[in-house]
Amino acid sequence: EWYRVYPTGYACTDEFTTDIELPLVRASQKRADLSRPLPYRYGFVRATAPQYLRIPTRAEQERSEFQLKEHLDWYREHEHEIQQVALGANDVALDRRGIAIPGGKWPTDRKLSNQMNLNELLGAEIPDPPIPFWLEGGKRLIPNVSAFGVPDYAVFADRVRRKTGLSLVGAFDGIDGESRRKFAIAVDLRLIPASKIKPDAGSPFHGIELNESVPIPFAWVLSDGCKSYRLIKGKDEARPRDDVPRRVIVPLSGTARIKAGQRYYQTGKEPTQWLRAEDLAVVAPPESWPEPANKGEKWIDISLRQQVLVLYEGKKPVYATLVSTGRDRLGDPKTTLSTPQGSFRLRSKHVAAAMDSEENSAVSGGSRSNSSGANGSEESSKATAARLLEAERDGKKLSTEDQRRLLNVKKGRDPEYGVTRRRGSLGFELRDVPWIQYFASGYALHGAYWHDVFGVPRSHGCVNLAPIDARYVFMWTDPPVPEGWHGINVGSEMGEGTQVIIRE
């Protein structure tokens, strides 16, 4: 039997239910919170863990988890220091449109991430929640709805690998006799020991609304240790002046000069102050206006060289932010980890979906041609490290980005990601990546809760946005996702997708 669903389409009763009192429906009532940049609570797996289907006994835990006693002893000693979080995406005050309010604060009755206890950081609504009804008595009253099928008697359904990003909807203390252990509830209703999860609040970074008081061109300062310069008249020389903080926004005059082989931009407020181009992400209009601009339509402008995204309504810029595109920046997307250039239209939108560590997803409409499997990123990192070390031995001049990568190599870190490799490396899963908008097979705009290096290319080809920006862009683009829906494929009934222009 088929039911018509609002506002368009049909659903078959073989695939859904209208009985809202079913245990599974009641157990899964906590849905994605569309009012927040991160629609779920998130964390990262610090040690391989079973994904339990019911509350395990202590004996079952010992059989299922390697060196459990040693792990729990270590956790009890370090719990307070390792489970702390910084303020994140959901802690930034937003207006009704989802734009960050400069200097704004949430009402005092709303808890910030650094005020929450561990249960709340893992998705619980209250500090000390009871055991969910569907897990009472050591049983499970609902079916296993994960993609990993197991017999009904199974204690757990698959293990979750270290570094996996988890989306969470709850947490509670499970009790087995005198043994007490906290469990987090994943979106697919499997249980993961809280001692093996590091909660995370995502990046609080965000872009800005553009208007008469914030005209373009301007730039974000990307580099730590950035300085302003004075250009010496009649000499091929630029002398350093003052320190300029990272991620500060600097108005530009539109004038550039070359000194000693480096490009400098003149600041808009002080004509004698110049900044190095390599320290900046510049927001400027395109050299020529594309078709949607001339038609007065909404469109998205992405510069791979500058790592910036600008939303336009016709020829009027309305919002700008930093992004992270494919890590090889301007390479061939068929053979490198680069974002394709060209004109595209959004083809699907999803509130959240799982991705693997190469940003492939079941909702992507196809894989990228550069997808290489779990070992591809590791081999690429090794090749990059070898190239940089050889260049240093040969005395070759390195770009600022390569200098950063070489410093990471010498510290024993991944050249591209540095210490953030712990949250975004090899063959693992990133669950419920938020605010996904596909513009080509395997390529999407989406939120990234696993890093905070926006302005630096580091993805496998997708366009990474900070969660606040990702949500705002998702809500701004067409067509809108109908109320109560989790995603749409763009078609004639939904309206045309917003145009995305990706250029050098």
Please tell me what each predicted stretch does.
Residues 100-174, 400-432:
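Intrinsically disordered, low-complexity acidic Ser/Thr-rich regulatory segments
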Residues 4-151, 185-226, 266-298:
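Boundary regions of SH3-family modules and the immediately adjacent low-complexity/disordered segments
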Residues 1, 163-169, 245-249, 480, ...:
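Loop/turn positions that initiate beta-strands
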Residues 3, 242, 307, 344, ...:
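Solvent-exposed, polar/charged alpha-helical surfaces in well-ordered, non-transmembrane soluble domains
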Residues 149-164, 232-248:
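SH3/SH3-like (including bacterial SH3b) beta-barrel domains
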Residues 2, 163, 180-181, 216, ...:
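Extracytoplasmic
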